Curated annotation (Swiss-Prot):
Core subunit of respiratory chain NADH dehydrogenase (Complex I) which is composed of 45 different subunits. Its EC number is 7.1.1.2. It holds the Pfam family Proton_antipo_M. It is found in: Mitochondrion inner membrane. It catalyses: a ubiquinone + NADH + 5 H(+)(in) = a ubiquinol + NAD(+) + 4 H(+)(out). This is NADH-ubiquinone oxidoreductase chain 5. It comes from the Eukaryota. Its main location: mitochondrion.
């Protein structure tokens, strides 16, 4: 084993140390959160070694030491894949998680079970690392299910609240639908290719691969909250803010997109699957951006923004640019985690107030949070030379110059423009104007745990895109030339969104309240999707099952088995007895005498 493989395994091993301490006195002490945070920061520093080695030499590796099990002709080994995706993703995820854990020490300090909370966060990170470094489908599935169950536990952390429990069950149920697709894809690979190792699957590269790829797209739709299976993501905001920052920025929600990126050698020659992925992503990115426009809960706006960015990543995979989608995953993690943490800072200081209509004027009382929120919003919209620009601008350029569906491209551009609108809306409502919160509210943002974590992520939101894009070797052929107007499209639509938001804000400040329009209702009620999908199918299945139960069980089976069958038997007996009355003399006369 060389330095490359040993540091990768050391990084994974170091993360498991605090979990092993569960039965010791450290776990019971109040130093445990600090211990977990230091462990994650150490793992981050260790993970930089293979990343630097990779950027200098381009070295990739598969660590396949442990033979696991042999089933007839299938050999399963515990193997780790240290390639472009896992080596780059690990430091990003660890850096973001380190900041989130430091933020959690401030945000969750009064929680009586804070040690268990930190253990859950760490377990969540470990399962994500298993998913990212897995080299066969079975190992990947362990990580896949791990992030699912940990998200259930973390979303339902405040289990005394009905909304939190409902949201946790909703998340797990929507993910079950995706898991069915994953299991079906695994079954297809096993029965047709007799292997779960990724190298062998890609080497065989079956020509008729529509079925397994459809299963993988269904899995990605469930995990990455694409249109149709998206309602769980805004509902998951019922969990604590650090959970929202960890799940919905860098880890769980990108797992679905990451799965499709892993399988890009199979998808790159399959035009049908690419078109499906692109159209699905385009619908998601526009629909969720529209939903974000009229929400009033600050966390829900950022959650819909996450879903919109995931749709953009799916579009990127659909135009055959998986490495670009991966770059967007890495850059997006920094500013999205920071946006969630800024909202957490505001919510915590305003005594758990999440409605942006009850905020305002926070730029005076919370200057640092204001700065980070504005930087994060600008990075999200793709303002030049911030982190988001380096991936988002490239995605729009690649989409503009690709020979693919112009409809998908057009609605992606509209969604990009809407990103600027809802980002501006948060800034106007929460930070500017007059304070609309109670005057007795005590606001202080002088805790180093909060400030240091936000500072680190703000540095990432400004510089990470530049560092990543200039140090990672290009894996796909970049676009050589394009007209200037195509080059400027992304910036133009973003500026259009900003202008539109400013214009609407200035014009509507003095207007009287009117009856809401149909488009406003559509956006506020999330396209009527939860209302229809969470009411009609359960109602139909419930009434159908009640009718079946009452007509088949009560009316037919239960009545026939006891009351009616007994009555029928007694009726026959009584009829027989009554028919025999007065016939004794006749029977005696029949008896022959000898």
């Amino acid at each position: 084993m060389n330095l490359f493989s040993s540091t990768t395994l050391t990084m994974l091993f170091v993360l498991t140390l605090p979990i092993m301490m569960t039965n010791t006195n450290i776990y019971k002490s109040d130093k445990y959160p600090t211990y977990v945070k230091n462990t994650v920061s150490s793992a981050f520093l260790i993970s930089l070694v293979p990343m630097i080695a990779f950027t200098n030499t381009g070295q990739e590796m598969i660590i396949s030491n442990w033979h696991w099990i042999t089933i007839q002709t299938l050999k399963l080994t515990l193997s780790f894949k240290a390639d472009y995706f896992s080596i780059v993703f690990a430091p990003v995820a660890l850096f973001v998680t380190w900041s989130i854990m430091e933020f959690s020490m401030w945000y969750m300090h009064s929680d009586p079970h804070i040690n268990q909370f930190f253990k859950y966060l760490l377990l969540f990170l470990i399962t994500m690392m298993i998913l990212v470094t897995a080299n066969n489908l079975f190992q990947l599935f362990i990580g896949w299910e791990g992030v699912g169950i940990m998200s259930f536990l973390l979303i339902g952390w405040w289990h005394g609240r009905t909304d939190a429990n409902t949201a946790a069950i909703q998340a797990i149920l929507y993910n079950r639908i995706g898991d069915v697709g994953f299991i079906m894809a695994m079954a297809w690979f096993l029965s047709n290719l007799n292997t779960w190792d990724m190298q062998q699957i890609f080497m065989i590269n079956p020509t008729h691969s529509n079925l397994p790829l459809m299963g993988l797209i269904l899995a990605a739709t469930g995990k990455s909250a694409q249109f149709g299976l998206h309602p769980w993501l805004p509902s998951a905001m019922e969990g604590p803010t650090p959970v929202s920052a960890l799940l919905h920025s860098s880890t769980m929600v990108v797992a679905g997109v990451f799965l499709l990126i892993r399988f890009y050698p199979m998808m790159e020659n399959n035009n049908l699957m690419q078109t499906i992925t692109m159209c699905l992503g385009a619908i998601t990115t526009l629909f969720t951006a529209m939903c974000a426009l009229t929400q009033n809960d600050i966390k829900k706006i950022i959650a819909f923004s996450t879903s919109s960015q995931l749709g953009l990543m799916m579009v990127t995979i659909g135009i055959n640019q998986p490495h670009l989608a991966f770059l967007h995953i890495c850059t997006h993690a920094f500013f999205k985690a920071m946006l969630f943490m800024c909202s957490g800072s505001i919510i915590h200081n305003l005594n758990n107030e999440q409605d942006i209509r009850k905020m305002g004027g926070l730029f005076k009382t919370m200057p640092f949070t204001t700065t980070t929120l504005i930087v994060g919003s600008m990075a999200l919209t793709g303002v030049p030379f911030l982190t988001g620009f380096y991936s988002k601008d490239l995605i729009i350029e690649a989409a503009n110059t690709s020979y693919s569906n112009a409809w998908a491209l057009l609605i992606t551009l509209v969604a990009t423009s809407l990103t600027a609108v809802y980002s501006t809306r948060i800034i106007f409502f929460a930070l500017l104007g007059h304070p609309r919160f109670p005057t007795s509210t005590l606001i202080h943002e002088n805790n180093p745990l909060l400030l240091n974590s936000l500072k680190r992520l703000m540095a990432g939101s400004i510089f990470a895109g530049f560092i990543l894009s200039h140090n990672l070797p290009p894996m796909t052929t970049p676009l050589m030339t394009m007209p200037p107007y195509l080059k400027m499209t992304a910036l133009a639509v973003t500026m259009l969104g900003f202008t539109l938001a400013f214009e609407i804000t200035l014009n509507t400040q003095n207007l009287k309240y009117k009856h809401p329009t149909n488009s406003f209702k559509f956006s506020t009620l999330l396209g009527y999707f939860p209302t229809i999908m969470h009411r009609l199918p359960p109602h139909l299945s419930l009434t159908a099952s009640q009718k079946l139960a009452s007509s088949l069980l009560d009316s037919a089976w239960l009545e026939n088995i006891l009351p009616k069958s007994m009555a029928h038997a007694q009726l026959k007996l009584s009829t027989l007895v009554s028919n025999q009355k007065g016939l004794m003399k006749m029977y005696f006369s029949i008896i022959p005498y000898h």
